[in-house]
Amino acid sequence: MAGATGLMAEVSWKVLERRARTKRSGSVYEPLKSINLPRPDNETLWDKLDYYYKIVKSTLLLYQSPTTGLFPTKTCGGDQTAKIHDSLYCAAGAWALALAYRRIDDDKGRTHELEHSAIKCMRGILYCYMRQADKVQQFKQDPRPTTCLHSLFNVHTGDELLSYEEYGHLQINAVSLYLLYLVEMISSGLQIIYNTDEVSFIQNLVFCVERVYRVPDFGVWERGSKYNNGSTELHSSSVGLAKAALEAINGFNLFGNQGCSWSVIFVDLDAHNRNRQTLCSLLPRESRSHNTDAALLPCISYPAFALDDDVLYNQTLDKVIRKLKGKYGFKRFLRDGYRTSLEDPKRRYYKPAEIKLFDGIECEFPIFFLYMMIDGVFRGNPKQVKEYQDLLTPVLHQTTEGYPVVPKYYYVPADFVEYEKRNPGSQKRFPSNCGRDGKLFLWGQALYIIAKLLADELISPKDIDPVQRYVPLQNQRNVSMRYSNQGPLENDLVVHVALVAESQRLQVFLNTYGIQTQTPQQVEPIQIWPQQELVKAYFHLGINEKLGLSGRPDRPIGCLGTSKIYRILGKTVVCYPIIFDLSDFYMSQDVLLLIDDIKNALQFIKQYWKMHGRPLFLVLIREDNIRGSRFNPMLDMLAALKNGMIGGVKVHVDRLQTLISGAVVEQLDFLRISDTEELPEFKSFEELEPPKHSKVKRQSSTSNAPELEQQPEVSVTEWRNKPTHEILQKLNDCSCLASQTILLGILLKREGPNFITQEGTVSDHIERLYRRAGSKKLWLAVRYGAAFTQKFSSSIAPHITTFLVHGKQVTLGAFGHEEEVISNPLSPRVIKNIIYYKCNTHDEREAVIQQELVIHIGWIISNNPELFSGMLKIRIGWIIHAMEYELQIRSGDKPAKDLYQLSPSEVKQLLLDILQPQQNGRCWLNKRQIDGSLNRTPTGFYDRVWQILERTPNGIIVAGKHLPQQPTLSDMTMYEMNFSLLVEDMLGNIDQPKYRQIVVELLMVVSIVLERNPELEFQDKVDLDKLVKEAFHEFQKDESRLKEIEKQDDMTSFYNTPPLGKRGTCSYLTKVVMNLLLEGEVKPSNEDSCLVS
């Protein structure tokens, strides 16, 4: 009987295979038979190259458009579509063979033909792009999916195809790949860029790519998120390619050996560093929804070699191989429905939970075997090359002429799907050699040529990678690049520091304490500029009126950019960092914060400086910095600089003229001025001219005003409803700056900014009080003034991007009120609107204190990311609540300090205190309150919630928020970032921090109970609130019995109970969880030792 069943199965399989083959009738190629037979040992170099030339001619160049030079995506008749990405690899394939032909003296014109096929394609793409120069200009200012360059063009005319609504054109990886191959090909001697219009256009492409770290796109697979619902994501593969392109093109001359100073491309060093940080924080993930992805292979290996860290490279590669490798190729990503038998070809997007259908039957792509072969060649690993060559051979096919063909993918036919799902890997797959995909997959064909040329040693890695994107570890020290793609070597970087005093009298005063400084006049002819003037200079970079392109967008220059020396219009210029700018936002008035910022900036430079030559850090000392009690901390910092070590960073202080010789010099030659053009005006930092016979006085002010001077005489609630004339009278009578500001704020809301008081308009009056309060360090009045005039720090948007770069979400809004979740970078204007809209209805001062915290957290998360471990969502309002709670704990029986009266540096220290791992001395109530406010979770928490959900058919509910089992488990995977965010969203409805922490503990208890009792599962919806209530009820019973006290509804004693121990919270939580589980059915298990029969 078994034999008959096996025979029937075999016959059935043959029938199904024949049916699948019938569907593929009309194929021009069949499985490979003779193409890989060993060729004669005495084959000449000409014979070897001639063989590959014929392959390239018949499987690549045959399809190249004679007009634009682009390559079609599908080679079946009549298809007019060309994808930038595919065409680039086709050009690279022709170029690779041209490099091999350079080794033959008499090549019969083939080198020229192949090189110019590549050039024609590269210029064809440039032609398509330049016709969309208006989109480059829009995207540069406002990067959105509806302002980007197109990724699809007509193969023969170069016209754009499909609107933004019909196709996801935002694929930054394609633009980055173009820039990368442009540099590689020009470095090999090809001439691709012809004139200054093209140079300025490429420079503008660089401006677009620089900010990839903050632009979610549709990725290599053109689908955005894994759910294929039209949403974009930040992809590691896109960021990695952008990083590689920026490293390759920085300081590169687009005219090659014939170039001059104005054909050089400039890259913002700080933007490049942001991309690097983003890539390292995203990996080994591809994005929030893609836990891993085969698109990472060309990112971490050929052609980008984007990773600095060998450990991260191995971790990422291992994950890709482990999760995606198959017999026929690599899956693109898990649950990828592309071209599977169950995908509906008529629908562009998937329905919710539809991706579960594709689990286990994803198509496998042989092209990734080729990437692994190339990676093996570059890394000198012949074993890897052979392994993937052996895997590739059985899946190759051949044309009727006998040339090898790489199928685009292998799929499971519809008749085999159920068998494959039941037994993964058991069914035969069939290649995509007909139908919608055309006859040849040109991207695969091109990569096959590159891989085989490298494997057969007809070209070397140095030939195809002339800019040395890949540098072996042992050779890293010998590579002279603008900044290498390789990570920092273990060196002891010394930062050069120049001390500049703003006036001569300040210099004399500091000299009496042994601090040697220079004034702006003493460093002449070197000019000192604020970074904003450098931004003005860079605005002239890439301007092209004919194409309608402006220069570099108005983006600040960061610490790395200001650590270089610039040659501008014959002048030598140094810039002081942005932290020394006199900002309109009040934080710049706190000297202790400035000292902290200087230490952070030096640590940042030490960690991320990658250029040859030492960084030059200019410390600008102002007279206001040393007044009163601010003098001692400032003097301590200057003494530490003089001694050569500050904050763990080695520094060398010297005269600016001496330090220039060891610095990096950037020539800004794009500022070419003709006789007819007017010279741009730049304002250098000018020396302060003090009044005659004046001296610097240390005693002129104090660091913080006395508490009594800070305390207002009036309250908003008391005076809000009083008539205007009474408010004006009180305004004239009181001398307290905080009280005056509060009264003016009431008038501002009621009468408007132009209402006249005795000292002018309300808005002008508030502005003057704001300045006076700042000089006196009356922080309460300062914050009121800043809030009423809606001050906004220019560094908020970059700091929020820093949160996102580190894989965190951020919420803005007051504790206990509606919050706005930010999961993608936003413009400063949008963030300002959110802050003032969400916070002003609660307390005017909240809007400015939230800005302070965003700035503080941005610095802390950059330098000490471990303080935010376990915190996926940073809720600013809740953190403020935690800080106020901490002040209450510290005050004991006395009235707590007002958070708004603390200086910004004291606020930062308080923030650092609550972020530190909780000290043992704290009671459990305080621990839970702080951890709950910080939204901190234990290690592996979200994975445990996933495991709970797997055994909870009706889902989990807490605070009225339901997390259903389906479609959650169908749409997502266990280690997916989006699932973790979904859990956070569920917990976000809880309004009490300590209660939230008890719920987190409860979920950990549920997970452990289920783990130890595999036969149990929940039959009904798990109501966490109900379980906590029952656990508290059990706790009350024990408390009243043991302590002989009446039951109390107040849960304080429960919150203050340790989790572990005989009567710990976990024992009560475990009891109610077990009760709920035992109410349901017990699933029998064969391994259960308790079974009696």
Swiss-Prot record:
PANTHER family per the UniProt record, alphabetical: PHOSPHORYLASE B KINASE REGULATORY SUBUNIT, PHOSPHORYLASE B KINASE REGULATORY SUBUNIT BETA
GO CC term, one of those recorded: phosphorylase kinase complex
Function of the molecule: Phosphorylase b kinase catalyzes the phosphorylation of serine in certain substrates, including troponin I. The beta chain acts as a regulatory unit and modulates the activity of the holoenzyme in response to phosphorylation.
Homology family: Belongs to the phosphorylase b kinase regulatory chain family.
An example molecular function term from Gene Ontology annotations: calmodulin binding
Activity regulation as described: By phosphorylation of various serine residues.
Phosphoserine found at: S12, S27, S701
UniProt-annotated location(s): Cell membrane
Free-text description of this protein's post-translational modifications in UniProt: Cys-1090 is farnesylated, but the C-terminal tripeptide is not removed and the cysteine carboxyl is not methylated.
Modified residues (N-acetylalanine): A2
Annotated site location: Not methylated: C1090
Stretches the record annotates as Disordered: 688-716
UniProt keywords, alphabetically: Acetylation, Calmodulin-binding, Carbohydrate metabolism, Cell membrane, Glycogen metabolism, Lipoprotein, Membrane, Phosphoprotein, Prenylation
Protein name, per record: Phosphorylase b kinase regulatory subunit beta
Swiss-Prot/TrEMBL GO biological process terms: glycogen metabolic process
Pathway terms, separated by semicolons: Glycan biosynthesis; glycogen metabolism
Residues with lipidation of kind S-farnesyl cysteine: C1090
Subunit and partners: Hexadecamer of 4 heterotetramers, each composed of alpha, beta, gamma, and delta subunits. Alpha (PHKA1 or PHKA2) and beta (PHKB) are regulatory subunits, gamma (PHKG1 or PHKG2) is the catalytic subunit, and delta is calmodulin.
Region (Calmodulin-binding): 7-29, 768-795, 920-951
Source organism (scientific name): Oryctolagus cuniculus (Rabbit)
Lipid bilayer topology: Lipid-anchor
